[in-house]
């Protein structure tokens, strides 16, 4: 696909005079364009749901979720991956973000990194990619060689693959087994795909990782019951989670958390089933960590 023919490289008539308007009008133009992004994502919800189901199946079987991207796309993958351990208590490495150019590229532009097909393959080899893993290639344009080569290598290994881009029929979309293509149209600043395209990608990644964690029993109701208390704010959140899940008071919630080494799931089962920490943990283990199964089946 030629660059000049890509939707993400097109000229946006709504912002053609943006350099001549007031600051407030400038903000309104950008905001009006941003409003279209959730609608574009809404149109591809079935594709996102299909990807979540595949990711969950692979991760449940011992695989990992691997994000692969360059520039903004790579940074968004790293951002999403880095939030999973503290939010959901998963081990670092279950969700991995890879960026063309390596760690330095998180904060700096690395010239030519996105054009390296070899880089995409080598980065996946370096993390020991296996057929159990799912590789999600992220590229607003859908033409990034680093991502395309990585997806090709992943498919050769037998991995399930997902391609996220904002141009229909792109190489990323056709290379991956599953395509998620929110078409957000031309950017306010021509070609600046960190804007609407980046926002769309962030929304999609939010759904992929959150959907995976919900289906993995990391959420009870709408509570993040595997949150790790790494600071005072999260200590308070743990207490509130146990309170909201059980109806107990703050003192009871704190006592239960202390008794089970601050594991929200265990504390919730302790309170709701009137169990000690050891028995509550045992029942959770018997039901794969799903609070709802412990409550519904016993």
From Swiss-Prot:
Enzyme Commission (EC) number: 4.2.1.126
Top-rank taxon: Bacteria
Further comment: A lyase-type mechanism (elimination/hydration) is suggested for the cleavage of the lactyl ether bond of MurNAc 6-phosphate, with the formation of an alpha,beta-unsaturated aldehyde intermediate with (E)-stereochemistry, followed by the syn addition of water to give product.
Class of enzymatic activity (EC top level): lyase
Known pathway: Amino-sugar metabolism; 1,6-anhydro-N-acetylmuramate degradation; Amino-sugar metabolism; N-acetylmuramate degradation; Cell wall biogenesis; peptidoglycan recycling
One Pfam family it belongs to: GKRP_SIS_N
Subunit structure: Homodimer.
Single GO molecular function: carbon-oxygen lyase activity
Functional note: Specifically catalyzes the cleavage of the D-lactyl ether substituent of MurNAc 6-phosphate, producing GlcNAc 6-phosphate and D-lactate. Together with AnmK, is also required for the utilization of anhydro-N-acetylmuramic acid (anhMurNAc) either imported from the medium or derived from its own cell wall murein, and thus plays a role in cell wall recycling.
SIS domain location: 55-218
Protein name: N-acetylmuramic acid 6-phosphate etherase
NCBIfam families: N-acetylmuramic acid 6-phosphate etherase, PRK05441.1, PRK12570.1
Active site: 83 (proton donor), 114
Keywords of the record: Carbohydrate metabolism, Lyase
Family from the record: Belongs to the GCKR-like family. MurNAc-6-P etherase subfamily.
Induction of expression: Induced by MurNAc 6-phosphate that releases the repressor MurR from the DNA. Repressed by MurR in the absence of MurNAc 6-phosphate.
GO biological process: 1,6-anhydro-N-acetyl-beta-muramic acid catabolic process; amino sugar catabolic process; N-acetylmuramic acid catabolic process; peptidoglycan turnover
Catalytically driven reaction(s): N-acetyl-D-muramate 6-phosphate + H2O = N-acetyl-D-glucosamine 6-phosphate + (R)-lactate
